[in-house]
């Protein structure tokens, strides 16, 4: 499927090239440089559910006229663009063709590109929970759910406390673009943790067959210390058990060396 280019942009490009290639005035000693940009832009929301087409006409880095499909007609951005906007708006054929570019150009190109390129790319998010301040229970705090490295941008992140969705005190950053086309976002929950409460960050994304849920449990410092001590004790126990088995195994084999001299006679 070939990509389409807005027809009026193409026509305008030919005119600009003719003007820029005109011979210089005889006797002129210095070159004059002109830059004309003709930009056709397509904006998509939820795939092709909503499409916006924008054509921009720029001369020496200054936009002079624009067509926006949400407006439905050409609008002059500067006085330089007023004659062109008025003329193009007076031509039903031009106006109808440009309005149709939402489908003939934007939708057409989206469907072609989606079939063959990274628009079908899916990257699963990584999810982690952190506490903004290390404080005791029953003090105001903020839980941060970090959702990173996902594609496409569409994502839904929710907070739950003991199985009930939290809507008060929830805020988030804007989507942050990574250099590899993936995204990340932080979703915060203002809360006051109490002993035994379970907070869950619930993430839904097109790349996932089922949502990702990550839990954070409210614990006192003493409970956390006991848990860490228990884990440390288990690790040390496994190490000493392994060391003891190794020593016992070596001692059962006995020392290696030449047989007693009497056995050789």
UniProtKB/Swiss-Prot annotation:
Modifications the protein undergoes after translation, according to the UniProt entry: Ubiquitinated in immature dendritic cells leading to down-regulation of MHC class II.
Cytoplasmic side: 248-265
Organism (species): Mus musculus
Family of the protein in this entry: Belongs to the MHC class II family.
Locations listed in the record: Membrane
UniProt-listed CDD domains: IgC1_MHC_II_beta_HLA-DQ_I-A (cd21001)
Entry GO CC: early endosome; external side of plasma membrane; Golgi apparatus; membrane; MHC class II protein complex; multivesicular body; plasma membrane
Keyword Oxidoreductase assigned: no
Protein name: H-2 class II histocompatibility antigen, A-Q beta chain
Residue span of region Connecting peptide: 218-227
Source organism superkingdom: Eukaryota
Gene Ontology molecular functions: peptide antigen binding
Glycosylation sites: 46
UniProt GO BP: adaptive immune response; antigen processing and presentation; antigen processing and presentation of exogenous peptide antigen via MHC class II; antigen processing and presentation of peptide antigen; immune response
Membrane-side (Extracellular) residue stretches: 28-227
Transmembrane segments: 228-247
Region (Beta-1): 28-122
Residue numbers spanned by region Beta-2: 123-217
Protein's membrane topology: Single-pass type I membrane protein
Annotated Ig-like C1-type domain residues: 125-213
């Amino acid at each position: 499927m070939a990509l389409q280019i807005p027809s009026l942009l193409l026509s305008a490009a030919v005119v600009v090239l003719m003007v820029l290639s005109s011979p210089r005035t005889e006797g002129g000693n210095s070159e004059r440089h002109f830059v004309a940009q003709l930009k056709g832009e397509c904006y998509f929301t939820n795939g092709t559910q909503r499409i916006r087409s924008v054509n921009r006409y720029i001369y020496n880095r200054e936009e002079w006229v624009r067509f926006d499909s949400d407006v439905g007609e050409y609008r002059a951005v500067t006085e330089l663009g007023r004659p062109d906007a008025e003329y193009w708006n007076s031509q039903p054929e031009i106006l109808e063709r440009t309005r149709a570019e939402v489908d003939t150009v934007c939708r057409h190109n989206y469907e072609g590109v989606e079939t063959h390129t990274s628009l079908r790319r899916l990257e699963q998010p990584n999810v982690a929970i952190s506490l903004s301040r290390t404080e005791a229970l029953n003090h105001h705090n903020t839980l941060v759910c970090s959702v990173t490295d996902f594609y496409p941008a569409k994502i839904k992140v929710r907070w739950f406390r003991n199985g009930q969705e939290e809507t008060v005190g929830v805020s988030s950053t804007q989507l942050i673009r990574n250099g590899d086309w993936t995204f990340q976002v932080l979703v915060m929950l203002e809360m006051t943790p109490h002993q035994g409460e379970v907070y869950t960050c619930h993430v839904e994304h097109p790349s996932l067959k089922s949502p990702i849920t990550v839990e954070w449990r409210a614990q006192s410092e003493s409970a956390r210390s006991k848990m860490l001590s228990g884990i440390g004790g288990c690790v040390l126990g496994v190490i000493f058990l392994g060391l003891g088995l190794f020593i016992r195994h070596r001692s059962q084999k006995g020392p290696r060396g030449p047989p007693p001299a009497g056995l050789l006679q």
